[in-house]
Amino acid sequence: MDWDHNVTFSAVRSLQATTAVAQATDNVVDLDRNRVDSRPGVLPTKNESSPHSSASLPPPSPHPPPPPAFTPSPSPSPSPSPQTATARSSVTDAAPAPKRSPRSPLHSNGSFPPVSDPISSIDSRDALDIDHESTAMLASSSSARKSKPKLQPQLINHLPLAQQAAMATFHEITFNDYHDKKLGRPPGKFDDYMICDCTPNSGNLDMACTDYSGCINRMTQIECSASKCRWGKQCRNQRFHRRQYVDVDIVQTEKKGFGLRACQDIPKETFIYEYVGEVMNQTTFLQRMQQYRIEGIRHFYFMMLQPNEYLDATKKGGKGRFINHSCNPNCAVSKWQVGKHLRMGIFAKRNIQKGEELTFNYNVDRYGNDAQECFCGEPNCVGTLGGKTQTDLSGMDDLFLDALGISDEVEQTEAKGSRRKRGKRLDLDFIPQMRAIQEHEATRVMTAARQAGPKREILEKLLRRMEMTTDVNVQKSLVKLHGFILMQFLLEQWWNDRDIVILIINVLARWPLIARNKVIDCGVEDQVRILAQTYRPRSPEDQKPSLDALRQVKQDDSAADRNDYTQVQPTLAPVRIGAPPAPDAEVSARAEHLLEAWKKLDMTYRIARKDALKPDADDHKDATAVTTWIDRRRMQDLDDPLDLEHAQAPNAVSSELGNALSGDQELREIKPSWQPPPAPPSMPNAPAKRMGGAVHHRSPPGSFTPTRLQSSGQSPLTPDQVTSVLSSSLVKSLSGLVSSLKQQGIQLQQQQQQQPPAQQQPSAQPAAPSAKSIEDIIREANEQEERARKEAEAAAKAARELEVNGGQTSGSSRKRPSSASRHSDKRAKHSSLSSSSQAASKLISSNGSAADSTSKAGSVESVAANERRLRKLVGELVVRQMSKYKDDLERESFKRHAKELTNAIVGKEMRNPKSWPPARGALTELSLDKRAKIKAFAKEYIDKLLARKGKGKGSSTPSNNEGAGSSNNGIV
């Protein structure tokens, strides 16, 4: 259409059209009302009751600050309508040049040309563009509502300072005031195990436990230890400890009381201030709520620290108490693990400009009386603060939304709501779809799980995501981010919640492990064992042992060293709040399967090196070193001390779990420190089948050959074979002496069992039973035993002489296990001789005696297995107890005394007729009473050892003799 460009529109017509567009925009988009209210000539609507109408911006001026997308005109504006439309525009690609023909007045430079020259400034085409833009704005109201503009920060530079008046309203404290020393400490072993992997191998301080270094402590909101971090004083993850606060001003607001204003530009993730106050339990918290309601205190100063523990900064606190609420906050509150306590810090959620008011969302963290009207003045204001539930998306922290993987969905569906629209609630009118964790989400998920606290709905979904994750790399990341310590914490907190417990067990069953040390050190194995006992169906008279187990695990380590452990009160009793759960066979069975899978892992004390885990690395167990968790973290020669490439994971808590790991267990048992004799031929031809029919090449020429007895279906081992294997094994290791002699007794008794059927065979092979007489067999066996005994005594004597000459500190204390070994040798020798003499008489007896011999052989074999199990259980307790004194002992001394103490305790236990052999046959676990007594005995031993060490090197030898003698007191 050919329009007449010479038609001139008056400036009044242009102004009216522009005003119509602005009014249409007002009815569609309700953004940034604070700036609108602060400008002259604009009346607020009935919904615009912003408390920051004058507190959010400087006083009105002829040149109000426009959005940063364009440059304001130097000439004053005759009308505020174009500027109002400009401030409320959702389009930011405007051009500052006045000569450019704008798409709409919303994109203009904020000023109009003089009315005296309307022809040169605006023509008919421009007016038509205005009409078209007005129609487009009205037609696209829904799209304008969904387009989220970038909200401009609220500056409060004009507000007056109120430092003195504000500080007079409360008592300022530097650190939290704990009503009880047990408060503020999360359950779990968070003392010596929260060490990061950062390596100070460069001079770049930006890598000193910062966001750029990938510090696992910083990523999981744990502050590094000032004394144990490898970066030392250069560590930048000690902000709470060093009180590295940002400079802030306390100002007087119009409707919100006092507030905080930034005195400098604050980058994102910066630590601003710690929120300190009185830490109290839930009972005191409820009393304080009632008291403050009576006193008329309506401001919110309560924060939940952890379940049943609250932080009150009403009358005691710091400057952080003055931070106000906002529905569009620039700060966030996070709970950090600092030493043994949980502490709350205020962090920058985004980049903050100088002069902004510092705010965070009270609906997320704070607790107060009834819901109150919100005065934040933000466009996305929900109208009230307080009165929100844990499932309200409007009050949910962005950390949880990101960890659940629903941030984008919540933003797109406007699930948080606004002042005119109610927000949605999780699992009620907003049901998210959970998915497996991606590798880049691992940090957020683990941090959110630590912060979940009483938010059960959120925690359950996070655990569900962990359970769904099958990616091995993601599972390794979860383990590295203190995963096992987190699970131990959650099991203590949610021990009576059946669904949460099942999820945690399923997650643990999928996490990879190199050795069993980690689950023992962090205490998660004890928690799973308690769950197995708690949920196991039992009769009413069996309830007391389960309660004793709960008290035993919860008691303090120092109190556990005493014998009378039943009188010790639990140190973390408030955690066990709630009724015990109902017995559940499924939970108990899954916990038992998980424990059995963990038991199949080795208990090692060395770093998992790649070269040490190769198949050709022979005798790698001989080179193991007893180290602690911190020692493994401090190893300078390893880039990755937590290498999980060769880790094993229980992939399912079921019967297939044990079958999958049994093969690995057999492979680990192939290379012991000493070679035991071959298994007794209880199953005919079993060795030949396993070895492909090959003949054992260790047999001497004059002994029976297995192939000569294959026709009778038997292949028994002769005493020559037994003693030959015994002597060869004794040369390799002295520690196998006692067990080898017992195995020899088993072989001799088995010989007696197998020989009578061989004599009753037809005369087709008469040479087999008559190759040697019974007297020759006994004589040769005795000669071999005597030679083996002399070789063992010579080796023991040489070892003792080497110990005496090697150092005075361990000379006398190491004689005691050797003496016990000699007594065991004598007893084993007498028993073997008696067995040999009895074999001659029983060979001519009836076949009924063979059945008795079979039962005796089985009992001897079970005793040997029980001894190995006892040594393993005692060794674990000894190493764990001695690790408390790791700083006072050198590594070699630690190893030596740990072995001595283990041998001493095992010897005492086996010499006690009341407890050995076990009454129920196979030994599975030590009783709680036995574990407590072993700990007490170990503590007494270590105390005497450290006392002798403190007297000086000159008096170490006589002190050792005295300590060795005194430590012979029985533990049972």
UniProtKB/Swiss-Prot annotation:
Region Disordered, annotated ranges: 25-122, 670-721, 748-772, 784-864, 948-972
Residue ranges annotated for the SET domain, each copy included: 246-363
Alphabetized UniProt keyword annotations: Chromosome, Coiled coil, Methyltransferase, Nucleus, Repressor, S-adenosyl-L-methionine, Transcription, Transcription regulation, Transferase
PANTHER family, A to Z: SET DOMAIN PROTEINS (PTHR22884)
Comment on protein domains: The AWS and SET domains are necessary for transcription repression.
Biased segments, Basic and acidic residues type: 784-803
Reaction catalysis annotation: L-lysyl(36)-[histone H3] + 3 S-adenosyl-L-methionine = N(6),N(6),N(6)-trimethyl-L-lysyl(36)-[histone H3] + 3 S-adenosyl-L-homocysteine + 3 H(+)
Designated gene of the protein: SET2
Protein name, per record: Histone-lysine N-methyltransferase, H3 lysine-36 specific
InterPro entries referenced in this protein's UniProt entry, alphabetically: AWS_dom, Post-SET_dom, Set2_fungi, SET2_Histone-Lys_MeTrsfase, SET_dom, SET_dom_sf, SETD2/Set2_SET, SRI
Cited SUPFAM superfamilies: SET domain
